[in-house]
Design a protein with these regions (language model features):
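Sec-dependent signal peptide recognition
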Residues: 1-7
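N- and C-terminal low-complexity/disordered segments
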Residues: 3, 16-125
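Hydrophobic core
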Residues: 8-14
Length: 125
């Protein structure tokens, strides 16, 4: 059921802007929230370069945005893993999110984590 809803949302975005009119970007701007400390930050994340936020490791796999002549939208494919508090690199990394996030509709596909919140703001132009 969830896949059907996401598919419908993607088709709405694609019908409004042709699939080939999306522009790729090497960087995304994410808003991060630590729910325990209530600290909010806007962070740039580069393509294929893991970014550490608390116990989360965020990796941007793809970022795209629409050109100025169509309704504004940004979409990013993110992989987010919870690495815990282990110091060694061989610690178990649990994937907590792997999918597309949309700047205009953050509730459609979002990270569900008890401590952290991550939202896509935009892709760098």
């Amino acid at each position: 059921m969830f896949g059907l809803v996401v598919g419908m949302v993607i088709s709405i975005f694609v019908s409004g802007a042709q699939a080939n009119s999306w522009l790729s970007s090497e960087q995304a701007f994410l808003q991060t929230l630590d729910k325990i400390t209530a600290r909010i930050a806007t962070v740039p994340v580069k393509l294929n370069q893991p970014f550490q936020f608390g116990t989360l490791e965020i990796e941007l796999k793809h970022c795209a945005f629409t050109p100025p002549e169509v309704p504004p939208e940004a979409a990013a494919f993110l992989e987010i893993r919870d690495v815990g508090f282990a110091d060694n690199e061989e610690a178990d990394k649990i994937t907590v999110f792997s999918g597309w996030m949309f700047a205009s509709s953050p509730a459609v596909s979002s990270l569900e984590h008890p401590v952290y919140d991550v939202t896509l703001l935009a892709c760098a132009k």
